[in-house]
């Protein structure tokens, strides 16, 4: 029972996390249906009335035109044909002329755009910012509703695309881990982790917990996933959509591919459009998935560039250390120059070090952002002045420790352990074993010893 309960709990937890991740997408779907109903109610009847009115105007125009032409023909033919025959012939000529111009009678089944399915497609073109232009509001209220709908829908779409991209990224990481496991590919930093764990055990420190390692690996898995694989998936999806459109719209493959790419990049010229509005929701779903793929790929490319820049900085820093040593050996860099006192000389030294790097490392350096270049220059200043600062700090610290050691010996009456007998005219030398070194200094206080009262003046040697 415990195993069953644990399994049910795991399933519920997974479902809860998945539902939480899909919640913005569910809200977006509901928002789409709500917007479709609103625009359908606002624009649907208006469009129908406009089409009916246009058809009436066309019919009236044709009737008047035919009548006038008929009257003219009657007068010209001098009653060689009946009026009905002349009317029919003239109407036929005008109808042919009208069809040649592309003016055809309105089809209430095909020419209606503001159906519920068409309204869904319109909502998708609004909040994805594609905007083909084939469906537009014709009323003031419709335009006002479009503006409000876009203000809410566009941020919601961005959030939904982010959630879809995150789910897609998780799927990529699962496939990548499965690939590594099935091919028994060992991570390149496994040996480093083993060494670190061994060092931690030897030093008595706490090793990294499996949960911490799992969290770190989950964060790095997506960056380690080859970006070429994601690009390949995106290309496959684009080709799939293009092939699907060739069957839905009877387009050639070039036209379908053009429409797909124009849509996925949210350019949306509107010159190529689906003709069957019953398939509009399917087109919208395909475009939404394509946009999420494009968004994911662009985000991952940015993360890959940032990771590459970080790796470049580490490589350049190592190369800098090697080039700095070579420059110092050749005398191009002065070891004792304080960069704060002579920044101009430090700049020349830094340029000399950069010039000694190989062309690939030097190229990576020039590709770094300005902020990281400045950081590397600051590291250069620290390295250039590190030796003199280190020597200065060591001397001061050593002197302080020696004086503390002498004071302790004085308080414990153990000065005889550190003193060496000298003649009366020679200064008394005191030795300290601080840091396993014997550093002589002259006594600066008045010392009293068992063999007599003698005064000694001290000063540093």
UniProtKB/Swiss-Prot annotation:
Outwardly rectifying potassium channel protein; activity is sharply augmented by increase in temperature. It comes from the Eukaryota. Changing residue 280 to I: In cn110; temperature sensitive defects in locomotion. Keywords: Glycoprotein, Ion channel, Ion transport, Membrane, Potassium, Potassium channel, Potassium transport, Transmembrane, Transmembrane helix, Transport. Residues 328-347 are annotated as: Disordered. The gene is twk-18. Expressed in body wall muscle. It is a multi-pass membrane protein. Residues 116-136, 253-273 dip into the membrane without crossing it. This is TWiK family of potassium channels protein 18. Disruption phenotype: Worms display uncoordinated movement and paralysis. GO terms for molecular function: outward rectifier potassium channel activity; potassium ion leak channel activity. The chain crosses the membrane at residues 22-42, 144-164, 225-245, 281-301. The keyword Transport applies. Belongs to the two pore domain potassium channel (TC 1.A.1.8) family.
């Amino acid at each position: 029972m415990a195993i069953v309960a644990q399994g049910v709990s795991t399933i519920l937890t997974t479902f809860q996390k998945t539902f939480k991740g899909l919640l913005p997408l569910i809200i977006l779907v509901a928002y789409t249906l709500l917007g479709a109903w609103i625009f359908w109610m606002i624009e649907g009847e208006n469009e129908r009335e406009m089409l009916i009115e246009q058809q009436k105007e066309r019919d009236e125009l044709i009737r008047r035109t035919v009548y006038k032409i008929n009257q003219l023909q009657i007068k010209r033919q001098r009653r060689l044909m009946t009026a009905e025959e002349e009317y029919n012939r003239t109407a036929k000529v005008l109808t042919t002329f009208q069809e040649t111009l592309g003016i055809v009678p309105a089809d209430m089944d095909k020419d209606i755009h503001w159906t519920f399915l068409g309204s869904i497609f319109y909502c998708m073109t609004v909040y994805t910012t594609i905007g083909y232009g084939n469906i537009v509001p014709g009323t003031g209220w419709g335009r006002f509703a479009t503006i409000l709908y876009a203000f809410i829908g566009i941020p919601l779409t961005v959030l939904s695309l982010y959630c879809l991209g995150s789910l897609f990224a998780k799927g990529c990481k699962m496939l990548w881990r499965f690939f590594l496991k099935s091919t028994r590919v060992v991570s390149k930093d496994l040996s480093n982790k083993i060494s670190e764990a061994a060092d931690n055990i030897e030093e008595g420190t706490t090793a990294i917990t499996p949960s911490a390692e799992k969290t770190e690996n989950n964060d790095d898995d997506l960056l380690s996933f080859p970006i070429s694989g994601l690009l390949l998936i995106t290309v496959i999806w684009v080709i799939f959509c293009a092939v699907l459109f060739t069957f839905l719209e009877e387009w050639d493959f070039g036209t379908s591919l053009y429409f797909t790419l124009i849509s996925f990049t949210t350019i949306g010229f509107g010159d190529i459009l689906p003709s069957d509005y019953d398939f509009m929701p399917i087109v919208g779903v395909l475009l939404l998935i394509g946009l999420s793929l494009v968004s994911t790929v662009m985000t991952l490319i940015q993360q890959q560039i940032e990771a590459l820049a970080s790796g470049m900085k580490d490589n350049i820093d190592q190369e800098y250390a090697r080039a700095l040593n070579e420059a110092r050996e050749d005398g191009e860099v002065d070891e004792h120059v304080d960069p704060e006192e002579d920044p101009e000389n430090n700049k020349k030294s830094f340029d000399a070090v950069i010039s000694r790097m190989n062309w690939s490392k030097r190229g990576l350096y020039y590709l770094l952002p300005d902020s990281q270049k400045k950081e590397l220059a600051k590291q250069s200043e620290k390295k250039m002045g590190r030796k003199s600062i280190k020597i200065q700090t060591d001397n001061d610290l050593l002197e302080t420790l020696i004086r503390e050691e002498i004071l302790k010996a004085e308080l414990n009456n153990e000065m005889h352990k550190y003193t060496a007998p000298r003649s009366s005219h020679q200064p008394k030398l005191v030795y300290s074993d601080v840091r396993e070194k014997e550093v002589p200094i002259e006594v600066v206080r008045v010392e009293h010893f068992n063999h007599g009262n003698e005064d000694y003046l001290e000063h540093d040697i």
